Amino acid sequence: MTTIIVPTDLSQVADNAARYAAQMVKGIYDVNFVLYHVYENDEDKESANILMDRLKEELQSRHMIKVQIKMEEGGDLIENVEKQARYFDAQLIVMGITGKTGKSKLEQVFMGSNTLKMIEKNVCPVLVVPSTAQYFEIKNVCLLSDFKDVETSMPEVPIKNVLNLFRPALHIVNVNSEHYVSLTPEFMAERGRLLEKFKEYRPEFYFIGTFDLVETAQTFVADKNIDMLITVPRNHSFFGSLFKTSNTKKLISESTIPILAAHE
């Protein structure tokens, strides 16, 4: 049984993420799909119940899935979601994020920070769905890897749990300005380890010698018709580094396709 938790504040961005997730698992019968909401008080609970029931009925009727509603009063959203993910032994959390346009700066920061905090919790992979993303069949997935300590840092099982939902073609990409005509022995060894881990997907490898990770990833996504991007954040100071450096933050905020963050 695959459990997916979709936290929602009942905003358009969160509803879009829920619809994306429901479409993604349409027709998969062993999925436990949990809509989760935190309300502030009894008055808020009454209106939230109506909206949650409405969203549940929409998702079930359109996508032929069984949806479970879980609601709680107050508390920290991220801590609550983490608790629910551990309780349900979730394999995936799906959250929406606001892009650079269309929303206020305050809303961008708030929604972005909640999503990134959830990634930092490292309870299970988090699928970040852009506010404008529409679901299309997931045929091509790109895994970005730094090819360092693959044996210990690559979260093979959590990534496979998600990939097995749709069995896509897997493209494994490394961006490094020091790549020349041939790979170093170190890169060849790490390539072999990645191939062994993901051999059932028959991955294709790409070593791109450029400086700009974000621009290169965006170009690759467009050229190869990539439907989902996978990143593997490092444990050390992930949340802080996202806001102090530009690469991962830009990658998430500017992406037009979902990004799966699976912690090492």
Predicted regions span which residues?
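Small/aliphatic-rich secondary-structure junction motif
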Residues: M1-E46, N140-Y206, I226-M228, E254
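Short secondary-structure boundary segments
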Residues: H37, I97, N174, P233-R234, ...
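Charged helix-capping and loop-helix junction motifs
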Residues: L51, F110-N114, E156-V157, E186-E190, ...
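Charged docking surfaces used in two-component/phosphorelay signaling
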Residues: M71-E79, F211-V214
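Short, well-structured alpha-helical segments in soluble
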Residues: N80-F88, T216-K224
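Hydrophobic alpha-helical segments and helix pairs
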Residues: K83-T132
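Glycine-rich, Arg-bearing micro-motifs that act as flexible, cationic patches
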Residues: G96-K117, V232-E254
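Short, flexible loop segments at boundaries between secondary-structure elements
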Residues: E254-E264
